[in-house]
């Protein structure tokens, strides 16, 4: 497997791995040049608004040249947003692929070495005899590729219903919704006496009281698993318990075969298998839904690239945030989603299903830019605000995301004020910035950015919102579902297998001899489990701290600090301080006297800004 990824030959093999001053490259690039002969010039050393540029003519000509050479091409990896094409677009894609390969090389080699060591150790200990033996996968292993280790509690508490339910409010919060008391119907029924015993009330009362929540993966029923692998298409009902004030699971419906509905009152192995089947669906969702966290900022940046000078302060920040961004789709197509590639080797549903899914979400109206703003998204699903039910007592994702976005927003507000003048609060400065307005028009026009702020952009608060959201997606939202999260949280086995290896049961009580060992038939064997962890470990980026590429470093690029003046430098200093405070709190998390952290029996740190890259890493 190692040789397959390292031996891939990309067109970008000889492209210089330095930041591309695209405007200058466009001005000098020969129309007949290849991807290996891109002219690379230094980044701008002074950022300025177009009306303040003493050489507006040359500036406008350079933008026109970029528009000739950087074009919107067909979507790849599913039918979502445009992917760059044209001579300059192809060169930038090739450059980013090379940057990605350089960044990933050490992580890849380390994960492969540690995989071999882990497999040898598991084999020497006799392999997996019970579900508890999956701890052999992790104990003492992956210390270099995953230096933070997997989440505390994720193995010791993997049978906990509270752990299972609270994953919806942390590791994968993007699929959960509260069922509105009047606008939403009950998705399926649960036996009344079971509901009464679990909740001390009725399903209808939970619904009416705004205490019922749904995760719906029934759409996965349309996909056919690979030979020898199996998948349900689970729906899960969760409820906010009025007695304990905890968020708990109520029922899981498989939607395939006999279409069984499981509850916590079933045999403990049947119920644990139901949670495993659900998490298998959930892992597919998180890994492929997150593709939209690539394509949305990509198309926003593409529109900016064709309309803003590289000397524009906003372009400088966007270029920084979109470091190596255009590598992910070609790399994914070459080694992850290719037939027989890493996806097919590890997941139950085939790569063709994985590629189809984000396009299906997009075709059904997903992928809206403003709809993805944190507060707006969570309110639309009834998870914050009290319009449709009682407040969630613990919402770790929202708690951490709110703080990180607050730090990003403070930076962006200071950046926008220093760029356009803070003293008089003159939002007319935005209207006079014709490049900025061209970007907004381009995004709403040829780029077809869904749900982008309308042109013209009149208020600087709107610009702050846009820039904050791009930085949040590239350095926050993406990493909740990808990057290091799967190997540390959402992909930890035995609770989160990428594939199931036995048929979905048609009757209850089919899970063996009453011990957890009976569940091994559905789970990956020793080699398959090591391969899953190895793949997910390769998604992690353990070296970003040493390379000064963390979220804390997002705005500290030397050219940005040198070219934007003291206001920018002061904003960056505060951002570093704010994110340092957040990081220290996260790093110090542990369990309270009840064995809980943020109301969960596992420690969640997926948004740590001192650990995560500031960019779309994988």
UniProtKB/Swiss-Prot annotation:
Per the record, what are the reactions this protein catalyses? Answer: (9Z,12Z)-octadecadienoate + O2 = (11S)-hydroperoxy-(9Z,12Z)-octadecadienoate; (9Z,12Z)-octadecadienoate + O2 = (13R)-hydroperoxy-(9Z,11E)-octadecadienoate; (9Z,12Z,15Z)-octadecatrienoate + O2 = (11S)-hydroperoxy-(9Z,12Z,15Z)-octadecatrienoate; (9Z,12Z,15Z)-octadecatrienoate + O2 = (13R)-hydroperoxy-(9Z,11E,15Z)-octadecatrienoate
According to its UniProt record, this protein's enzyme class is oxidoreductase
Coiled coil residues, start to end? none
What cofactor does this protein call for? Mn(2+)
What region holds the Lipoxygenase domain?
Answer: 47-617
Where in the sequence is the signal peptide annotated? Answer: 1-16
Q: Which residue windows does the record flag with biased composition (Polar residues)?
A: 46-58
Q: What is its EC number?
A: 1.13.11.-, 1.13.11.45
List the Pfam families: Lipoxygenase
Recorded GO CC terms:
extracellular region
Spell out the Low complexity composition-biased ranges.
Answer: 36-45
Where it sits in the cell: the answer is: Secreted
Q: Which GO terms describe its biological process?
A: linoleic acid metabolic process; lipid oxidation
Q: Which UniProt keywords apply?
A: Dioxygenase, Glycoprotein, Manganese, Metal-binding, Oxidoreductase, Secreted, Signal
Question: Could you tell me which PROSITE patterns the record lists for this protein?
Answer: LIPOXYGENASE_3 (PS51393)
Modification after translation: N- and O-glycosylated.
Give the UniProt family note: Belongs to the lipoxygenase family.
Q: What is the protein's known function? A: Lipoxygenase that metabolizes linoleic and alpha-linolenic acids to 11S- and 13R-hydroperoxy fatty acids. At the end of lipoxygenation, the intermediate product 11S-HPODE from linoleic acid is then transformed into 13R-HPODE as the final product. It also acts on alpha-linolenic acid producing 11S-HPOTrE and 13R-HPOTrE with subsequent transformation of 11S-HPOTrE to 13R-HPOTrE as the final product. Gamma-linolenic acid is a poor substrate. Oleate and arachidonate are not substrates.
Q: What is this protein called?
A: Manganese lipoxygenase
- Origin organism of this chain? Gaeumannomyces tritici (Wheat and barley take-all root rot fungus)
């Amino acid at each position: 497997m190692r040789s397959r990824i390292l031996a891939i030959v990309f067109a970008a093999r000889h492209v210089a791995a330095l930041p591309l001053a695209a405007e200058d490259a466009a001005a000098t690039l020969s129309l007949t040049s290849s991807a290996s002969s891109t002219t690379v010039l230094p980044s701008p050393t002074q950022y300025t608004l177009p009306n303040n540029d003493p050489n507006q003519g040359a500036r406008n000509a350079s933008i026109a040249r970029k528009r000739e050479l950087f074009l919107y091409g067909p979507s790849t990896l599913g039918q979502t947003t445009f992917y760059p094409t044209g001579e300059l677009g192809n060169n930038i894609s090739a450059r980013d692929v090379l940057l990605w390969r350089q960044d990933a090389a050490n992580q890849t080699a380390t994960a492969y070495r540690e995989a071999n060591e882990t497999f040898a150790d598991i084999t020497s200990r006799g392999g997996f005899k019970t579900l508890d033996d999956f701890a052999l996968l992790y104990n003492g292993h992956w210390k270099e590729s995953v230096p933070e280790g997997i989440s505390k509690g994720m193995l010791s508490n993997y049978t906990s219903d509270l752990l299972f339910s609270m994953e919806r409010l942390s590791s994968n919060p993007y699929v959960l919704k509260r069922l509105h008391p009047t606008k939403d119907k009950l998705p399926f029924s649960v036996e009344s006496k079971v509901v009464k015993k679990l909740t001390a009330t009725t399903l209808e009362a939970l619904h009416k009281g705004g205490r019922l929540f749904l995760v719906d993966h029934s759409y996965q029923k349309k996909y056919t698993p690979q030979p020898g692998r199996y998948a349900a298409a689970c729906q899960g009902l969760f409820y906010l318990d009025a007695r304990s004030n905890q968020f708990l699971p109520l029922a899981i419906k498989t939607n395939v075969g006999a279409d069984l509905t499981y509850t916590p009152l079933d045999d403990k192995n049947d119920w644990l298998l139901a949670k495993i089947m659900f998490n298998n669906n959930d892992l597919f969702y998180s890994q492929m839904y997150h593709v939209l966290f690539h394509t949305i900022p990509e198309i926003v940046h593409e529109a900016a690239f064709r309309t803003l000078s590289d000397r524009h302060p906003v372009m400088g920040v966007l270029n920084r945030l979109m470091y190596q961004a255009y590598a992910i789709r070609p790399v994914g197509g070459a080694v992850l989603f290719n037939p027989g590639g890493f996806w097919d080797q590890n997941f139950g549903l085939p790569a063709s299903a994985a590629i189809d899914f984000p396009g299906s979400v997009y075709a059904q109206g997903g992928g809206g830019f403003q709809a993805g703003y944190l507060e707006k998204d969570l309110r639309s699903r009834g998870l914050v605000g009290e319009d449709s039910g009682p407040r969630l007592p613990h919402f770790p994702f929202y708690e951490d995301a709110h703080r990180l976005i607050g730090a990003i927003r403070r930076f962006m507000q200071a950046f926008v004020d220093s760029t356009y003048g803070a003293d008089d609060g003159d939002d007319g400065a935005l209207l006079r910035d014709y490049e900025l307005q061209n970007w907004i028009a381009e995004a709403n026009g040829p780029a077809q950015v869904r749900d982008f702020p309308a042109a013209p952009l009149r208020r600087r608060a709107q610009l702050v919102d846009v820039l904050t959201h791009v930085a949040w997606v590239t350095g926050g939202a993406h990493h909740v579902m990808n990057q290091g999260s799967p190997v540390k949280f959402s992909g930890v086995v035995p609770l989160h297998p990428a594939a199931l290896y036995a048929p979905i049961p048609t009757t209850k009580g089919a899970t063996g001899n009453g011990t957890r060992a009976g569940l091994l038939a559905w789970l990956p064997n020793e080699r398959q489990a090591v391969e899953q962890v190895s793949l997910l470990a390769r998604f992690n980026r353990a070296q970003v701290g040493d390379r000064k590429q963390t979220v804390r470093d997002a705005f500290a690029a030397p050219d940005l600090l040198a070219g934007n003046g003291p206001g920018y430098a002061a904003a960056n200093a505060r951002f570093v301080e704010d994110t340092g405070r957040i990081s220290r709190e996260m790093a110090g998390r542990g369990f309270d006297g009840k064995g809980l952290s943020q109301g969960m029996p596992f420690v969640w740190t997926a948004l740590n800004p001192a650990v995560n890259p500031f960019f779309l890493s994988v």
